[in-house]
UniProtKB/Swiss-Prot annotation:
Keywords associated with the record: Aminoacyl-tRNA synthetase, ATP-binding, Cytoplasm, Ligase, Nucleotide-binding, Protein biosynthesis
Compartments it resides in: Cytoplasm
InterPro entries in the record: aa-tRNA-synth_I_CS, aa-tRNA-synth_Ia, Leu-tRNA-ligase, Leu_tRNA-synth_edit, M/V/L/I-tRNA-synth_anticd-bd, Methionyl/Leucyl_tRNA_Synth, Rossmann-like_a/b/a_fold, tRNAsynth_Ia_anticodon-bd
Keyword Ligase set for record: yes
GO MF annotation, one: leucine-tRNA ligase activity
Descriptive protein name: Leucine--tRNA ligase
Lineage: Bacteria, Pseudomonadati, Pseudomonadota, Alphaproteobacteria, Hyphomicrobiales
Residues the entry annotates as binding ATP: K647
CDD domains associated with the record: Anticodon_Ia_Leu_BEm, LeuRS_core
Catalytic activity: tRNA(Leu) + L-leucine + ATP = L-leucyl-tRNA(Leu) + AMP + diphosphate
Length: 886
């Protein structure tokens, strides 16, 4: 296996390029990262979000996969049977865009990119089970996805319905609400339009309550992510209120043909306590009343059309200017029939939330307040803040949205808003309008069904057939997979499948008559909603193997960006529940632990021509200030903000270049060392050089001491300096273990720098120290290599071999610390005088309260204070603090 270093000369620099490749080949040859099913050890499944094969990996990938690899290698060393797979999230628009621009087939483009990126990932020395690799565009994978679709369809979890959708006019496809950001398509950046199309939906809303309740169990997820999902699911408890409608023509004694069909409207409200502050009703532009009125009113029809130019999402509606169209209808107040409230059609009311109609109380809601100010409507406060007098309460520039006491509200006056809610509900449930109760308590969810239809080629075909006689029918399971045709053209935007007659033409599986295939493909978020389950048995004939999922799921540790907090993570949680319902799995949640890592960021540079890349400049210190100059002509370049690495701003660093210059271990060490893993890491050349110097320093110390240490058996010291070294080593091992368990990689790295500093002077004179110290040094070095191995695996292997070992570091068990050696013999307590810290005292670990008191009273700064004032008492909190009260 070539695990010796005799050809190195003493003092020769470590050559990462040659060494790293060697160890990667040895790991591959021995298949040490291939996971064995049915192994008796405790299982641990660690997974990083798999990448989209865009062409090259970036530093964000490196950090993400380095984190996952540290966890995988550490858990393997701790005796777990680790599953750490890799695959490719390979369907999607960029491949079609490349086909349009470069005239290369999406399949060719995708698989070529996968080959490049696989090579890049392998250079990083990741302990991945490559035998389980798949791409979601593999026919084998999307065949199983089509099987899942049919299973869901048979269970009633798939619906086909006409829906208003977000249409991306650049990508010529439908976007889910979650894929619209600030009214624009998440990929194209185009302003989204609203269209009505017949779409396929997964009925995720059936699981709203369960998805919400499940969040309580996910205590190993960031609180922020759980909150985001909670808000997205959006459970609210409110009241359905039926309002009688009248035409303003009635009040004027005119004709009542305005809207004879509508004598009432139902509003949903989470704040029925504010009913006496209502000054308008607002209906969605899609409400049946709005549609009916628009048939007779051209101005209203034009208003509705104009509203449809914006996005359909809540976010889009919240940011758009509030607009309303006054109708010839008024609503009769449920508790006072003499009060008539104007009815508007408004652009900020969603038809698919609640009932598509709301009542506005401007005094206590920002949106209603803005609307009332714009249309000069009354703003009547009905909730008074506590400890405030009515005459002092003025709503000048903003509504009051806090708690308080009801005012200006008839029989509700003096109640709290919560009590008023219940009172209004009770009265309206007993009050009758047109033979039915006028109010009803209800629970609503914001979560909508997941529209999965996409009008594009490079996605998983939806296995349905359209027959003029039989309607829409599923493709028989035996006829799967529905394979994408290769002979498609990309000479125009839109879906090539819709133009491919031969592929579409098929016999109806029920009546045998000519029929057409569904040309929509599935949203690519479907592909990533179950891949983690497929990894447990990637070649099973069924989508998942129940025994394998029972063994491996949920994923113990999932790692990825917080940008997926809602979309991907919510869809994956839905998929697990759906797969459980159809009998494929026995667990509810896909991911037990979730870690969201920060980004890799870099300075930006620009000159008159635009953005400049780091490779094109040199940085020099001038008068104590950093200045940037172009390498070509030495012209000055402006140093801009530190931002996320992006091609558009040219502030990217190619991992290949850095690995070629410094080696993978240096890159891995740096991206994990500079800041806590949940925070952004700032990429700097000096930081990388510092990491590389550490690599060389480790190697130098091992190379210089190897001749002596290779023949020494490791053993803890029993006395003197050897004992002190062993104590430091065992404490360090204990602390680093704790850091790795908590994902505190940067803390572990800081300790390892410190530990090398402790060992260095002893290693420098290793030939001259006593045998007990040699044995303690050898044990300390073995511990050190075990601790750096998850982060810098190649260097650890090389050093391990240099010390005469023929085993692989990657297969070694994690060392065990001696509890007796990690006990602290003393500890330091902060000492306060009258609650202010004045100094510290160090006491023996076994010191009693009396001994601590004596030590504190003997301190000079305490003595000085006692001269001026006598002591009243001394408060001692063992292991925490001492407070002397004068």
């Amino acid at each position: 296996m070539g695990m010796t270093i005799e050809h190195y000369k003493i003092g020769e620099r470590y050559n990462p390029r040659a060494r790293e490749k060697k160890w990667q080949e040895i790991w591959d040859e021995k298949k040490i990262f291939q996971t064995v099913q049915g192994d008796g050890r405790e299982k641990y499944y660690v997974l990083e979000m798999f990448p989209y094969p865009s062409g090259r990996i970036h530093m964000g990938h490196v950090r993400n996969y380095a984190m996952g690899d540290v966890v995988a290698r550490y858990k393997r060393a701790k005796g777990f049977n680790v599953l750490h797979p890799m695959g490719w999230d390979a369907f999607g628009m960029p491949a079609e865009n490349a086909a349009l621009q470069s005239k290369v087939h999406p399949k060719t483009w995708t698989y070529e990119n996968i080959a490049v990126m696989r090579g890049q990932l392998k250079q990083l020395g990741l302990s991945l089970d490559w035998a389980r690799e798949f791409a979601t565009c593999d026919v084998d994978y999307y065949h199983r996805q089509q099987m899942l679709f049919l299973d869901f369809y048979q269970k009633g979890l798939v619906a086909r319905k006409v829906a208003k959708v977000n249409w991306d006019p650049v990508d010529h496809t439908v976007l889910a609400n979650e894929q619209v950001v600030d009214g624009r398509g998440w990929r194209s950046g185009a302003l989204v339009e609203q269209r009505e199309l017949t779409q396929w939906f997964f009925k995720i809303s059936d699981f709203s309550e369960d998805l919400l309740a499940g969040l309580e169990e996910l205590d190993q997820w960031p609180e922020k992510v759980r909150t985001m999902q909670k808000n997205w699911i959006g459970k609210s408890q409110g009241l359905l209120i039926r309002w009688a409608l009248k035409s303003t023509a009635d009040d004027a004694g005119g004709s009542n043909d305005v809207c004879e069909a509508f004598d009432e409207v139902v509003c949903y409200s989470t704040r029925p306590d504010t009913l006496f502050g209502a000054s308008f009703l607002a209906l969605s532009v899609d409400h049946p009343i709005a549609q009916s009125l628009a048939k007779k009113d051209k101005a209203l029809a034009a208003f509705i059309e104009n509203c449809r130019c914006g996005g359909t999402t809540t976010a889009a509606l919240e940011t758009a200017e509030k607009q309303g169209f006054l109708t010839p209808l008024v609503a009769v107040h449920p508790f006072d029939e003499t009060v008539h409230i104007p009815v508007y059609i408004a652009n900020f009311v969603l038809m698919d939330y609640g009932t598509g109609a709301i009542f506005g109380c401007p005094a206590h809601d920002q949106r209603d307040f803005d609307f009332a100010r714009k249309y000069d409507l009354p703003i009547k406060p009905v909730v008074l803040p506590r400890e405030t007098k009515v005459e002092d309460f003025v709503l000048a520039e903003m509504p009051y949205t806090g708690d308080g006491v009801m005012i200006n509200s008839s029989f509700l006056d003096g109640l709290t808003p919560q009590q008023a809610f219940e009172e209004v509900a009770k009265r309206l449930e007993q009050q009758v309008l047109h033979g039915q109760p006028q109010g009803k308590k209800t629970v609503q969810f914001r979560l909508r069904d997941w529209g999965i239809s996409r009008q594009r080629y490079w996605g998983c075909p939806i296995p349905m057939i359209h027959c003029t006689s039989c309607g829409v029918v599923p493709v028989p399971r035996a006829d799967l997979p529905v394979v994408l045709p290769d002979d498609v053209t990309f000479d125009q935007p839109g879906n090539p499948l819709a133009r491919h007659e031969m592929w579409q033409d098929v016999a109806c599986p029920i009546c045998g008559q000519p029929a057409k295939r569904e040309t929509d493909t599935m949203d690519t978020f479907v592909d990533s909603s179950w891949y983690y389950a497929r990894f447990t048995a990637p070649f099973a004939p069924e989508p998942v193997e129940k025994q394998a999922t029972a063994e491996w799921l949920p994923v113990q540790q999932y790692i990825g960006g917080i940008e997926h907090a809602i979309l991907h993570l919510l869809y994956a949680r839905f998929f697990m529940r759906a797969m459980k319902l159809v009998g494929h799995v026995s667990v509810d949640e896909p991911f037990k632990g979730l870690f969201t890592q920060g980004m890799v960021v870099h300075e930006t540079y620009r000159d008159d021509q635009g953005w400049v890349s780091p490779a094109e400049i040199s940085i020099v210190e001038k008068d104590g200030k950093r200045c940037a100059y172009k390498l070509t002509d030495q012209s000055e370049v402006t140093i801009g903000l530190i931002e996320k690495m992006s091609k558009s701003k040219k502030n990217v660093v190619d991992p290949d270049d850095i690995i070629a210059s410094y080696g993978a271990d240096t890159v891995r060490w740096f991206v994990l060392s500079d800041s806590p893993p949940e925070r952004d890491v700032i990429w700097t050349e000096s930081g990388v050089e510092g990491a590389h110097r550490f690599v060389q320093r480790v190697w130098r110390h091992v190379a210089l001491s190897a001749a002596v240490l290779k023949d020494v058996a490791p053993r803890a010291g029993h006395q003197g300096a050897a004992l002190e070294l062993s104590k430091a080593a065992h404490r360090m091992l204990h602390a680093v273990e704790d850091d790795l368990e908590k994902f505190a990689f940067n803390r572990a790295i800081a300790r390892l720098y410190e530990f090398l500093n402790i060992m260095a002077p002893l290693l420098n004179k290793v030939a001259d120290v006593e045998d007990e110290m040699k044995a303690a040094l050898r044990q300390a070095m073995d511990f050190f290599l075990a601790m750096i191995a998850p982060i810098m695996p190649h260097l650890a292997e090389e050093c391990h071999a240099a010390l005469g070992e023929t085993t692989l570091m990657s297969e070694l068990a994690w060392p065990v610390y001696d509890p007796a050696l990690i006990v602290e013999e003393s500890y330091t307590l902060p000492v306060q005088i009258n609650g202010k810290k004045r100094g510290e005292v160090t006491v023996a670990a076994t010191a009693s309260e009396t001994m601590i008191k004596e030590a504190v009273l003997a301190l000079d700064f305490v003595q000085a204070q006692l001269v001026e004032k006598p002591m009243k008492k001394i408060i001692i909190v063992p292991q925490r603090i001492v407070n002397v009260v004068l």
